[in-house]
UniProtKB/Swiss-Prot annotation:
Residues 1-21 form the signal peptide. It is a single-pass type I membrane protein. Residues 71-92 are cytoplasmic. Belongs to the alphaherpesvirinae glycoprotein J family. It is found in: Host Golgi apparatus membrane; Host endoplasmic reticulum membrane; Host endosome membrane. It comes from Human herpesvirus 1 (strain 17). Inhibits host cell apoptosis. Induces an increase in reactive oxygen species (ROS) in the host cell. This is Envelope glycoprotein J. The lineage of its organism: Viruses, Duplodnaviria, Heunggongvirae, Peploviricota, Herviviricetes.
Amino acid sequence: MSLRAVWHLGLLGSLVGAVLAATHRGPAANTTDPLTHAPVSPHPSPLGGFAVPLVVGGLCAVVLGAACLLELLRRTCRGWGRYHPYMDPVVV
């Protein structure tokens, strides 16, 4: 995989994870009945039954993005090490 593809996958994974995390809404903050002031159960997620798969998918996208960005960092540092005057040459 080329360095550019790794870079784009890393950015895409990070952005998808951030968007999914930002769009997920938890239970409602006000959980009391306005008339009786009795506690009520929170409203279901506005995403319905898809909330858990979206969160898991977002976490997977974040992990993919982090792995790609770490691979990019590893390749970049290896490339810099080849030209450092005080280091032995790196055999690839």
